From Swiss-Prot:
Binding site for Ca(2+) 4: 141, 143, 145, 147, 152
Gene name of the encoded protein: Ppp3r2
Superkingdom classification of source: Eukaryota
Residue span, EF-hand domain: 18-53, 57-85, 87-122, 128-163
GO biological process terms, semicolon-separated: calcineurin-mediated signaling; penetration of zona pellucida
Task performed by this protein: Regulatory subunit of calcineurin, a calcium-dependent, calmodulin stimulated protein phosphatase. Confers calcium sensitivity.
Pfam families reported in the protein's UniProt record: EF-hand_7
UniProt name for this protein: Calcineurin subunit B type 2
Residues that bind Ca(2+) 3: 100, 102, 104, 111
Site (Interaction with PxVP motif in substrates of the catalytic subunit): 118, 122
Entry's localization field: Mitochondrion
Amino acid sequence: MGNEASYHSEMGTHFDHDEIKRLGRSFKKMDLDKSGSLSVDEFMSLPELQQNPLVGRVIDIFDTDGNGEVDFREFIVGTSQFSVKGDEEQKLRFAFRIYDMDNDGFISNGELFQVLKMMVGNNLKDWQLQQLVDKSILVLDKDGDGRISFEEFRDVVRTMEIHKKLVVFVDHGQED
């Protein structure tokens, strides 16, 4: 896994030396097969993630090299986006990327449907969900191109102060 402390300066994360060391210990605990990277199953071993329908999308975003697993560098960079010291724009971009599944800079009708389907499961019929998606696109799509840009997303979500809820705290408690 390398020297965890060097990641702060190398990658410009929002974590200090001690936080990176603590995250390194957490990463090692999660890395059940000791491969040096985290699979979806290893992420799902965390009770707080087991019920999160979007954990797969979060892993996709953390996994910048696209190999299906999250190594320590990807873990630190990804987690840093949720640091209390992280900025609003970074948090909003992360939230936008949850929906922008093809990473083209826009949320399409189909992408919004897929992500909302992950969240609601079978609680809504597909036609009901599609109505919700269509109405959402109509409201959010200010330029009328049929899709939601980051700017359109940001303008709406910023007023909800979602970025203040997208925070992770690194435990400063006693050593294990």
